[in-house]
């Protein structure tokens, strides 16, 4: 791409109505322009970033076998009346009537539409499980749009919906989506925390939010750093792995099979909750070599007194697996952990799938630290039980186990293995694409402008030719490098404007192109060009003959 043929709409001044850094930079760098309150046009530079985020999401969805579809943003009211959400949603649902006086809405979500589609297209259990996704514009009539695209009325979202014949099948897909989301956010370069959340208006019985840390936003959370006088929690040294261990029913068998120290295993005990509690059962987690202290546990306000342990049947009914495979990740019950568990790292626990275990679990990386209490007979001395710090965050992803919330009321059934009709079990999984862009810009910037990772930068390489329109040599070399990089499928922007070098540098650095090639007569006289790394400011002279191969190798690495 050449700047002479491109809409590079940069501005110098910081817009007065932009409250947060991401909104300021998105306006200054020519990424978005406001059309009306909460409505934005995406300019070419912004659209390039947006498409790269979409492509990362699409690639990872394809990698796990999800199938892409496209559903209308305009939805008939009758589907929402059928599900019951027409009356539950407030004024944020934009409703309208067509010329035939039929009621419609602009969809903020697509649970009803996808459920209607699948109940008409899928007839047998043999066609399940199924995971469908789309990347689509949504609309929510926010009462007070703010912070640019962080809280706008129109937004782009990746939403996926899975259909199953059992809770165990749903749990397997839920776990897969959970880790796929972490892969997506890692590729984009976001610092994301995962917390168990209220399903809200979407519904269901279990959900997790993916929260990106940002510099300034109205939503806040407390992060807990737990430390232990005798055993400081170590930094993660292992990757999270899902390991098969069929036929294992006790800690002793698990220790023998994998030659594990028992203190590296965390076990979960399920007990009855207080009467009238939201959940009938509560999960307690202790180290493998520790036992719970009945008197201590009975003091907990969530737990029934006297203490009653859940039966194997109660556990399987509530969670879908036996007690030997219980673990903290995606556990659909309130969880309280012992102080000794709070300082564990790279530990082992069940995966909430029969015969499967997670190895290398770490708090805050793989799941948020839940409530911590003294559950055991151990006399633990904690020097700093809780170090709290408040941070700003924005939700960039949310996954839900919907169960039969929509399929039951909308009669979405398939013929089961026994020949009888059965209600499908559902999950749904969302990523806010436009919010992800804003969160990434919030994280990656400096006083010059954007510092986006190569994976989502609008261009990979910029060529700045000094005195392009006065030097035939500079013009020739600039064209050669531009063509060579383009042939190698590198996203390159050639700044061929009749502008001063200072203006070109300011614009290229503002929009955040990570690799910059500077061409000038003085360096060309000795067959050299200058290279600048946008992220760390590194500059060096390089041989003209190797620059293309060197850039390509750097990008591929």
Swiss-Prot record:
One of its GO terms (molecular function) is ATP binding. GO terms for biological process: prolyl-tRNA aminoacylation. It catalyses: tRNA(Pro) + L-proline + ATP = L-prolyl-tRNA(Pro) + AMP + diphosphate. Gene3D superfamilies: Anticodon-binding domain, Bira Bifunctional Protein, Domain 2, YbaK/aminoacyl-tRNA synthetase-associated domain. It is found in: Cytoplasm. One of its GO terms (cellular component) is cytosol. Its EC number is 6.1.1.15. CDD domains: ProRS-INS, ProRS_anticodon_short, ProRS_core_prok. Its main location: cytoplasm. It is an enzyme of class 6 (ligase). Keywords: Aminoacyl-tRNA synthetase, ATP-binding, Cytoplasm, Ligase, Nucleotide-binding, Protein biosynthesis. The keyword Ligase applies. PROSITE patterns: AA_TRNA_LIGASE_II. Catalyzes the attachment of proline to tRNA(Pro) in a two-step reaction: proline is first activated by ATP to form Pro-AMP and then transferred to the acceptor end of tRNA(Pro). As ProRS can inadvertently accommodate and process non-cognate amino acids such as alanine and cysteine, to avoid such errors it has two additional distinct editing activities against alanine. One activity is designated as 'pretransfer' editing and involves the tRNA(Pro)-independent hydrolysis of activated Ala-AMP. Homodimer. Belongs to the class-II aminoacyl-tRNA synthetase family. ProS type 1 subfamily. Consists of three domains: the N-terminal catalytic domain, the editing domain and the C-terminal anticodon-binding domain. This is Proline--tRNA ligase. The gene is proS.
């Amino acid at each position: 791409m050449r700047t002479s043929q491109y809409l590079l709409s940069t501005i110098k001044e910081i817009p007065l109505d932009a409250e947060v850094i991401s909104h300021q930079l998105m306006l200054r760098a020519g990424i978005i322009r406001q059309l009306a309150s909460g409505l934005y046009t995406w300019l070419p530079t912004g659209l390039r970033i947006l498409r790269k985020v979409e492509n990362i999401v699409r690639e990872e969805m394809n990698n796990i076998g999800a199938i892409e579809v496209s559903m209308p943003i305009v939805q008939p009211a009758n589907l929402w009346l059928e599900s019951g959400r027409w009356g539950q949603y407030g004024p944020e649902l934009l409703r309208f009537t067509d010329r035939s006086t039929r009621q419609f809405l602009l969809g903020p979500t697509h649970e009803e539409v996808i459920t209607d589609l699948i109940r008409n297209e899928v007839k047998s259990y043999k066609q399940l499980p199924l995971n469908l996704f789309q990347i689509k514009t949504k609309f929510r009539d926010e009462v007070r749009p703010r912070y640019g695209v962080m809280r706008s009325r129109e937004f782009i979202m990746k939403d996926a919906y899975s259909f199953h014949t059992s809770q165990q099948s749903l749990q397997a897909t839920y776990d897969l989506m959970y880790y796929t989301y972490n892969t997506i956010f890692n590729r984009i370069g976001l610092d994301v925390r995962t917390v168990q959340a209220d399903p809200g208006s979407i519904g269901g019985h279990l959900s997790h939010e993916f929260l990106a840390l940002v510099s300034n936003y109205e939503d806040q959370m407390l992060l807990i750093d737990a430390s232990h006088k005798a055993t400081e929690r170590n930094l993660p040294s292992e990757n999270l792995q899902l390991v098969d261990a069929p036929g294992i029913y006790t800690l002793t068998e698990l220790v023998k099979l994998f030659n594990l120290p028992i203190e590296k295993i965390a076990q979960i005990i399920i007990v009855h909750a207080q009467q009238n509690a939201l959940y009938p059962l509560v999960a307690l987690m202790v180290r493998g070599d520790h036992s719970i202290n009945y008197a201590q546990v009975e003091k907990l306000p969530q737990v029934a007194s006297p203490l009653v342990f859940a039966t194997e049947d109660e556990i399987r009914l509530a969670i879908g697996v036996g007690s030997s495979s219980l673990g903290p990740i995606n556990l659909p019950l309130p969880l309280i952990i012992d102080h000794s568990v709070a300082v564990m790292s790279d530990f082992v626990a069940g995966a909430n799938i029969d015969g499967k275990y997670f190895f290398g679990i770490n708090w805050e990386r793989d799941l948020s630290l839940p409530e911590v209490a003294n559950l055991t007979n151990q006399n633990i001395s904690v020097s700093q039980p809780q170090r709290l710090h408040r941070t700003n965050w924005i939700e960039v992803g949310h996954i839900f186990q919907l169960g039969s919330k929509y399929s039951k009321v909308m009669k979405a059934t398939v013929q089961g293995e026994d020949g009888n009709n059965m209600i499908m079990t559902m999950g749904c999984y969302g990523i806010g694409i436009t919010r992800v862009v804003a969160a990434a810009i919030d994280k990656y910037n400096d006083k010059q402008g954007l510092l986006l990772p190569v994976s989502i930068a609008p261009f990979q390489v910029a060529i700045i030719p000094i005195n392009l329109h006065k030097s035939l040599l500079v013009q020739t070399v600039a064209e050669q490098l531009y063509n060579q990089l383009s042939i190698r499928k590198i996203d390159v922007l050639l700044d061929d404007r009749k502008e001063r070098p200072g203006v070109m540098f300011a614009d290229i650095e503002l929009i955040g192109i990570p690799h910059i090639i500077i061409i000038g007569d003085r360096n060309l006289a000795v067959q050299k060009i200058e290279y600048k790394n946008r992220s760390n400011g590194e500059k060096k002279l390089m041989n003209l003959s190797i620059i293309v191969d060197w850039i390509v190798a750097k990008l591929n690495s």
